[in-house]
Swiss-Prot record:
Family in the record: Belongs to the eukaryotic ribosomal protein eS17 family.
Gene3D superfamilies hit by this protein: Ribosomal protein S17e-like (1.10.60.20)
Keywords noted in UniProt: Ribonucleoprotein, Ribosomal protein
Species this chain originates from: Methanocella arvoryzae (strain DSM 22066 / NBRC 105507 / MRE50)
Keyword Kinase: no
InterPro entries xref list: Ribosomal_eS17 (IPR001210), Ribosomal_eS17_CS (IPR018273), Ribosomal_eS17_sf (IPR036401)
HAMAP family: Ribosomal_eS17
Superkingdom of the source species: Archaea
Annotated protein name in UniProt: Small ribosomal subunit protein eS17
Keyword Zinc set for record: no
Pfam name, any one: Ribosomal_S17e
GO molecular function: structural constituent of ribosome
Entry GO terms, CC: cytosol; ribonucleoprotein complex; ribosome
Gene that specifies this protein: rps17e
A GO biological process held by the record: translation
């Protein structure tokens, strides 16, 4: 349980990955800084959720190759 994310987290993550595909990697800390730089997020919690989802998607993308 707990792995279902809100729609705005998913849509923001997909938009960021579409616009900036080479900016993100599988490191959460680096992704957190990039999300804060590239997106206007209201709270630290939302920023961390987006960065975590970006990290998860990038890690799974690396495993698929």
């Amino acid at each position: 349980m707990g792995s279902i994310r809100q729609t705005y987290i998913k849509s923001t993550t997909d938009a960021l990955l579409r616009q900036y595909p080479n900016e993100f990697g599988s490191d959460f800390t680096a992704n957190k800084a990039k999300v804060e730089q590239l997106a206007s997020v209201q709270t630290k919690e939302v920023r961390n959720r987006i960065a975590g989802y970006v990290t998860r998607k990038m890690a799974s993308k690396g495993r698929k190759k």
